[in-house]
Amino acid sequence: MDSGDIEEAGGNGEEEFRSGPRLGGSKYRPVVAHDRAVVEMSSIDPGSSSSTLKNIKVVAPGDVGAGVRGPEDGVNGHQKESKLELFGFDSLVNILGLKSMTGEQIQAPSSPRDGEDISITQGHPKPPALKMGTMMGVFVPCLQNILGIIYYIRFTWIVGMAGIGQGLVLVFLCGLCTFLTTISLSAIATNGAMKGGGPYYLIGRALGPEVGISIGLCFFLGNAVAGALYVLGAVETFLKAFPAAGIFRETITKVNGTAVSESIQSPNSHDLQVYGIVVTILLCFIVFGGVKMINRVAPAFLVPVLLSIFCIFIGIFLAKTDDPDNGITGLRLKSFKDNWGSAYQMTNDAGIPDPTGGTYWSFNELVGLFFPAVTGIMAGSNRSASLKDTQKSIPVGTLAATLTTTSLYLISVLFFGAVATRDKLLTDRLLTATIAWPFPAIVHVGIILSTLGAALQSLTGAPRLLAAIANDDILPILNYFKVADTSEPHIATLFTAFICIGCVVIGNLDLITPTVTMFYLLCYSGVNLSCFLLDLLDAPSWRPRWKYHHWSLSFVGASLCIVIMFLISWSFTVVAIALASLIYKYVGLKGKAGDWGDGFKSAYFQLALRSLRSLGANQVHPKNWYPIPLVFCRPWGQLPENVPCHPKLADFANCMKKKGRGMSIFVSILDGDYYECAEEAKEACKQLATYIEYKRCEGVAEIVVAPNMTEGFRGIIQTMGLGNLKPNIVVMRYPEIWRRENLTEIPSTFVGIINDCITANKAVVIIKGLDEWPNEYQRQYGTIDLYWIVRDGGLMLLLSQLLLTKESFESCKIQLFCIAEEDSDAEALKADVKKFLYDLRMHAEVIVVTMKSWDIRSEGNSQEDSLEAFDAAQRRISDYLGEIKRQGSNPLLANGKPMVVNEQQVEKFLYTMLKLNSTILSYSRMAAVVLVSLPPPPLNHPAYFYMEYMDLLVENVPRMLIVRGYHRDVVTLFT
């Protein structure tokens, strides 16, 4: 029996149904191919309901057209997948392990039942890349990067200059900065899966791609140049320990201006360059060997370093005290007390105390000198792509390395301050080698290997950081450095080596060194700010496994980083921030759009919610009123298929904003059933949004599917917007094509939209002559004429002022025509309107037009066009009424009410529109744009009649805005 059939098979059918699909008698069994914690539901237990399943054939959707499957395929193939099909989603078995589970917006692969084939790798699968654990992946790299040359050759000098007390403060301050940064790093790194890139990945996902790339590239540059610093330190120590190894020797006859009895052969500066290039190339070969080679070599660099530090401490305890003139006193309380205070003074270029020297050292300068000795905490996170478990290794390994080195420094301050006199601390550059047991050479080896180990870690982490930035595909210029997930970043390594060799060739890095320190501090402040923002927002997705964090700690860490930057050098701080700002701007201009769900988006969301709540449900005060137009994109007329919105509608929407401030909502309605047109609506919405962005109009796009346009607009006008951010003005095109397209549907829809706007208390702006509306480059001259007939809350006045703020209308002047009754006092009305405009801070020429009872036909030939339109409208309305009378029935309106026609009232409406149109043509035929009040549709009049009224109003006016306000003021007299 096929696995897809359930049939009654005599007396044994039920037994076969019971026993066939059960494997091993278990109801649930593990799915070995994916996750042992995921179980697969067994076949349906027939039980008492088995009788309802008889004689039913079940065919899986994926089997249609695929031929007949064998029994094995039914059990092991698609049957497993189809048991949860009724939920409408892929089962956990199908989605576990996809990259989309990490929060990245990646398209999931199609299911085989979509008709696509599954690609099966032939032969042996590719072995997984070697992954590192906490010790070799994080702790050792961090320790190698932190323990550098400063501890060996400058730390004793720092203790002598700052004293034990301020030395402890100095170490504690710098250690606190890195400790707080490690806490923030641990929190972010344990908040989900982490790909390559280390701090760049964390900062970018928290603060956005622009901030992430700008800080990430600065951090990459800092690592690359730091590699050169470490290489030069190793080579310089080697040449001082073995002068005979110099290739380009120079003869020294004077030392500090004093002639020596015998000339001294010393290595030349070119030796630094040659040896530095050779060492850099050798280190690059190790890096090219991959993670496996680095893991083998790293202990060889670290073990001698730890051994040399151990020998230094043995030498401290075994220091000879029989020669006090040598300056080494052994561990003595007297030395401890003498060295407790600071001794800031002038020194020469070599750091030797000299009253005539050119350098004065203070606490701030010592911070800049010592801080590179605590950097390197990002060495483990830089290789996050090579770690087995980032959420475990990064916090434990980084924190252990930070605490270990900080404790070492604090203990060293106490011991160095108690083992020698201050003069010895300030004059012996290699005091650590002098006191080391059993001989100084072991410290020389430690210095060389520590700097080489730090250089190796820099040349390992920097290329991976650059490759991670390139793989995010934000900056096209970095595409050359892209690598596959399991590949080594060879091109990025070559580029890093090129930068490193260039700095080695320069040789003198005194000006670059502070900038490198700034890049490290800039990265640390970015990590702290990221954790601060995520902690403060506390989004539902913020669930780090590392629980020992708080937004206040991150804030203190970020503040401390910035303070230390300015303590070291405010000028180099400005340079580092300026470089990061330039990269930020470049990414914003040239980079591709990327949405990583960063913290800024969450902050904007929460700020928007808080602002929306603070607005409340009360009406907005006129001083704070902004137009929020609801732009009706395609209500009538046909546009090209690739143009989702009339181009001039976007131009007009921009005219309603002062200096771009405001928001427009562009909506369009698709006729049809939502279930059938949902995908079409999504594509149309994307197309409309893209077009709005192309027109540089700030707004949002919405597509609504409805049975017809009237129902769709009614739903939009009721539900669009939130709180006080609902649209307050409906903007649409005047249907000039209604007479030749549809004599019934367009008028009915047009009148229905206006009535819905009045009911919803929305303002209305109808644009006649939209095709001739000027764009931002078409400058207009003349006047903007307002025909103020009814009180509209000042909306028409406000629109005219907004038009003047645009380049296309800034050369125009405003004329305000007040339409008065025949018995009104024109002069008094004019004076009142001028006073009103003055109080509103608006400039306009006021003209009062009195609508007298005059016969329009006595005005001569100037209004022949209006008269012809009037006569034509009369004839069409008479024919319409005659047709109704001949039918002998009482027709109903669109709202179901009976149509009641008063022919005298119809004549009055037509005559009023005729007089208003003739007045507009008399005064405003050459106006840039005319604004006139919108008359509401008369009750119980057919929509056809209203369209005749409106056609008569706009006759021969090339460009007109028909405006209706709502029952509230949008302008105010008061400040």
Curated annotation (Swiss-Prot):
Localization per record: Membrane
Topology in membrane: Multi-pass membrane protein
Keywords per UniProt: Glycoprotein, Ion transport, Membrane, Potassium, Potassium transport, Sodium, Sodium transport, Symport, Transmembrane, Transmembrane helix, Transport
Tissue note: Expressed in young seedlings cotyledon tips, plant vasculature, root tips and axillary buds. Expressed in root vascular strand in the pericycle and other parenchyma cells bordering xylem vessels. Expressed in the xylem/symplast boundaries of rosette stems, rosette leaves and cauline leaves. Expressed in stipules, trichomes and hydathodes. Expressed in pollen grains.
GO cellular component, one term: trans-Golgi network
Domain of life where this protein originates: Eukaryota
UniProt topological domain (Cytoplasmic) ranges: 1-132, 189-214, 295-296, 381-398, 456-490, 537-544, 593-975
Residue numbers on the Extracellular membrane side: 154-167, 236-273, 318-359, 420-434, 512-515, 566-571
Region called Disordered, residue ranges: 1-29, 104-124
Glycosylation sites: N256
Phenotype upon gene inactivation: Bushy plants with small leaves, short roots and short inflorescences containing a higher number of stems. Alteration in pollen grain development, high number of aborted siliques and few siliques with low number of seeds.
InterPro entries in alphabetical order: AA-permease/SLC12A_dom, SLC12_C, SLC12A_fam
Transmembrane segments: 133-153, 168-188, 215-235, 274-294, 297-317, 360-380, 399-419, 435-455, 491-511, 516-536, 545-565, 572-592
MF GO annotations: sodium:potassium:chloride symporter activity
Role description: Cation/chloride cotransporter that mediates potassium-chloride and sodium-chloride cotransports. Involved in plant development and Cl(-) homeostasis. May be involved in long distance Cl(-) transport. Does not function as an H(+)-dependent cotransporter.
Family designation: Belongs to the SLC12A transporter family.
Other information: Cotransport is inhibited by the loop diuretic bumetanide.
Name of the molecule in the record: Cation-chloride cotransporter 1
